[in-house]
Amino acid sequence: SDREAEVIRIPTSAILQEEENMYVLVELGNNDYRKQKIETGHTEDGKTVVLSGLNVGDEIVVTGAFYLLDAR
């Protein structure tokens, strides 16, 4: 179905958790980032389904996300 084709999967390591909320860091360019709240689905083989909060084509920080967050 069309719905299935639009599933966004991201590396689980890209997800930051604060209390009950899940976030990723979206790259805006020029070393600028935005913390984006997401809703996640199930995880498989190191990838997690994102149900809402991200669009196809968004660039997210995968490695060192914690460090990036702390440094800002």
Model-derived features: where do they sit?
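Hydrophobic alpha-helix/coiled-coil detector that fires on Leu/Ile/Phe-packed helical surfaces
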Residues: 1-6, 15-16, 26-32, 44, ...
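Exposed loop and linker-edge segments at protein-protein interfaces
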Residues: 9, 37, 47-72
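Short edge beta-strand segments in beta-sheet-rich domains
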Residues: 10, 19, 33-35
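ATP/adenylate-binding site constellation spanning eukaryotic-like Ser/Thr protein kinases
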Residues: 12, 21, 65
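Amphipathic alpha-helical segments that mediate coupling or scaffolding at interfaces
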Residues: 13, 27, 39-41, 71
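Residue-level recognition of beta-strand microenvironments
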Residues: 15-18, 40-43, 53
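Short aromatic-glycine-enriched beta-strand elements
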Residues: 21-23, 48
